Amino acid sequence: DKCVRAVAKRFTGVEHRIELVRELNGVKYYNDSKGTNPDAAIKAVQAMVTPTVVIGGGYDKGSEFDLYVKAFKDRVKLLVLIGQTSDKIEATAKKYGFTNIIKAESLKEVVDICAENAKDGDAVLLSPACASWGMFDNYEQRGRLFKEYVNAL
């Protein structure tokens, strides 16, 4: 019992799964690059307890994004999109009245946009709801680059 509690206290989570990268200027940056489908990304969005800037988009596996966008209600203040699905996710978001959207060309640009728009007390969440292919070799590479860019801020 004592041993289990000690291990639980030291456990920092699993890489790329709602992983806290750092807190900077009161903004917490989370890497959930493993959120490669809408269902996984919804769970990450629902785990956020402060206003959140969500980074979404990537390779189009034919997913629908209606439930993903509906999960934004009263949680997400800005959606920053990247990759092949940018237009599809943007159209779905606008269909449900969510219009605070910025599109970017690179992950570095995404991180810079998030840093400019997130305020003290906010969270920034990379939970793309899409595969990484096309821009990255895999979700691990995408997540590690995200962490590198965030740590360089």
Predicted segment positions?
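Short beta-strands and strand-loop turn motifs
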Residues: 125-129
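Phosphate-binding loop of NTP-binding sites
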Residues: 134, 147-153
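Nucleotide phosphate-binding/pyrophosphate-handling subdomain across enzymes
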Residues: 1-76
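Phosphate- and divalent-cation-binding pockets in alpha/beta enzyme and binding domains
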Residues: 40, 88-91, 135
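C-terminal helical cap/extension that packs against the catalytic core
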Residues: 66-122
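A short acidic, helix-capping loop that chelates divalent metal ions and anchors anionic groups
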Residues: 27-28, 132-135
